[in-house]
């Protein structure tokens, strides 16, 4: 199975992501690589540990937007919920959603890292 098939199996809407880029698979893969770098440098969980919710909102917004652009559906949906909860002053609930998505996110990120050509 190639990278895109593996991502599909994880719930990523690869076909929609490619459609957004007019079918340019090379560009899609390059942007997936950029997303990995962003996730590694923009981790939201430390902000929760330090009660830095303004910072968490900014990072979550960036992750949500990029995940949406790439149709990384599980990540996009979770960060949409996290943002909504943080913006309505529900950090405990947002942290619970983050805890659920982090293993899924890590699986997707690891898959991308391991399968980049």
Residue ranges and their predicted role:
Residues 1-2:
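C-terminal compact regulatory domains
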Residues 12-62, 92-116:
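Long, amphipathic alpha-helical coiled-coil segments characteristic
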Residues 55-57, 67-87, 97:
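Short, well-ordered alpha-helical segments
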């Amino acid at each position: 199975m190639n990278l895109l098939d593996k991502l599909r199996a994880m719930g990523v809407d690869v076909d929609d992501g490619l459609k957004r880029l007019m079918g340019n698979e090379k560009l899609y893969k390059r942007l997936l690589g950029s997303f990995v770098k962003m996730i590694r440098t923009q981790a939201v969980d430390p902000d929760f540990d330090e009660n830095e919710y303004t910072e968490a909102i900014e990072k979550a917004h960036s992750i949500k937007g990029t995940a949406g652009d790439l149709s990384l559906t599980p990540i996009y949906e979770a960060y949409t919920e996290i943002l909504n909860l943080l913006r309505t002053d529900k950090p405990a609930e947002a942290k619970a959603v983050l805890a659920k998505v982090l293993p899924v996110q890590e699986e997707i990120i690891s898959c991308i890292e391991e399968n980049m050509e």
